[in-house]
Amino acid sequence: MNNLRKTHPLIKIVNHSFIDLPTPSNISSWWNFGSLLGLCLIIQILTGLFLAMHYTSDTSTAFSSVAHICRDVNYGWLIRYMHANGASLFFMCIFLHIGRGLYYGSYTQTETWNIGVVLLFTVMATAFVGYVLPWGQMSFWGATVITNLLSAIPYIGTTLVEWIWGGFSVDKATLTRFFAFHFILPFVIAALAVIHLLFLHETGSNNPSGLNSDPDKIPFHPYYSVKDLVGFFMTILVLLTLVLFTPDLLGDPDNYTPANPLSTPPHIKPEWYFLFAYAILRSIPNKLGGVLALVASILILILVPLLHTSYQRGLAFRPLTQMLFWILVTDLLTLTWIGGQPVEQPFIIIGQLASILYFLLITTLIPLTGLLENDLLKW
């Protein structure tokens, strides 16, 4: 068996990725989120598959098919709420995973990082089209508002929006194609995740010290496989607590009203995990400018490796940049809060200041502080 593990063409790949993989001996629980994202993806694909067996992607029956899943299908309510809250958990893990990468300088592995940014865009697209499927008020109006943003693209905008809609408004054709996209994209995510791992295993994992860990590696199994299992159980506990006690905590009550094109909800807002980007979009009083800022708020992650100025990889021994990092985290939380507030003062000005600070920190303040710390090292 031992020999088969190392010689069999298929088992050999698994062995090199999850069993005999040389791993730094000092990686903390912040390194658990990669495997937790894999767990989230598996949960989402499985629950999504069972939901798709009962869901109908037609405007006249979509809303009632979701109600039917919750009322009549065996444990349908459990599957539906695990899928809905699983998405929130997915994004929670993504944000912590990216935060870890920023803090410990994992972005210096540029291929892995860039594939990660592509993964983030794909997951965001999947979540967006998925939110439209229950065909409630917020589903319909969210789809209308967000797809409408593309009309800001000069010359081709209007044509592009009508092409995506499959008509002159969000309707039956839109819902059907969004269901198709929502079904296929998770498999694209799975493929990208494999490439993400492929590039990661070319260089090996980073570690909290940011130093080369080649002299001190241990096998992934049993050490980190068991450590990952602990993370799995804790995460499943959090998910089940959310699903069984407060399943609607993170949802919008408006989505329990069937979609009605003739009645606009008082506050159109996306799910909590998009609120920071939504706040940046709304902070610019120009449509095209807002769309560009929205895309830039995520795309800016591509620039992070290029803006690394410090002699040190992570922030473990850089107190000044550490302070700026936590200001960035606070700023993102502020943007998330603002995204859920109505467009009125003082929220408008707070959102604009938080948006400016967000871009300023990443592009200017953190790189300059890195240079300052380099000089301080020479004292």
Curated annotation (Swiss-Prot):
GO terms for cellular component: membrane; mitochondrial inner membrane; respiratory chain complex III. The gene is MT-CYB. A ubiquinone binds at residue 201. Belongs to the cytochrome b family. The keyword Nucleotidyltransferase does not apply. It is found in: Mitochondrion inner membrane. Its cofactor is heme b. The chain crosses the membrane at residues 33-53, 77-98, 113-133, 178-198, 226-246, 288-308, 320-340, 347-367. Heme b b562 binds at residues 83, 182. SUPFAM superfamilies: a domain/subunit of cytochrome bc1 complex (Ubiquinol-cytochrome c reductase), Transmembrane di-heme cytochromes. Binds 2 heme b groups non-covalently. Heme 1 (or BL or b562) is low-potential and absorbs at about 562 nm, and heme 2 (or BH or b566) is high-potential and absorbs at about 566 nm. Heme b b566 binds at residues 97, 196. It is a multi-pass membrane protein. This is Cytochrome b. GO terms for molecular function: metal ion binding; ubiquinol-cytochrome-c reductase activity. It holds the Pfam family Cytochrome_B. Keywords: Electron transport, Heme, Iron, Membrane, Metal-binding, Mitochondrion, Mitochondrion inner membrane, Respiratory chain, Transmembrane, Transmembrane helix, Transport, Ubiquinone. InterPro entries: Cyt_b/b6_C (IPR005798), Cyt_b/b6_C_sf (IPR036150), Cyt_b/b6_N (IPR005797), Cytb/b6-like_sf (IPR027387), Cytochrome_b (IPR030689), Cytochrome_b_C_euk/bac (IPR048260), Cytochrome_b_N_euk/bac (IPR048259), Di-haem_cyt_TM (IPR016174). The cytochrome bc1 complex contains 11 subunits: 3 respiratory subunits (MT-CYB, CYC1 and UQCRFS1), 2 core proteins (UQCRC1 and UQCRC2) and 6 low-molecular weight proteins (UQCRH/QCR6, UQCRB/QCR7, UQCRQ/QCR8, UQCR10/QCR9, UQCR11/QCR10 and a cleavage product of UQCRFS1). This cytochrome bc1 complex then forms a dimer. It comes from Ornithorhynchus anatinus (Duckbill platypus). GO terms for biological process: mitochondrial electron transport, ubiquinol to cytochrome c. Component of the ubiquinol-cytochrome c reductase complex (complex III or cytochrome b-c1 complex) that is part of the mitochondrial respiratory chain. The b-c1 complex mediates electron transfer from ubiquinol to cytochrome c. Contributes to the generation of a proton gradient across the mitochondrial membrane that is then used for ATP synthesis.
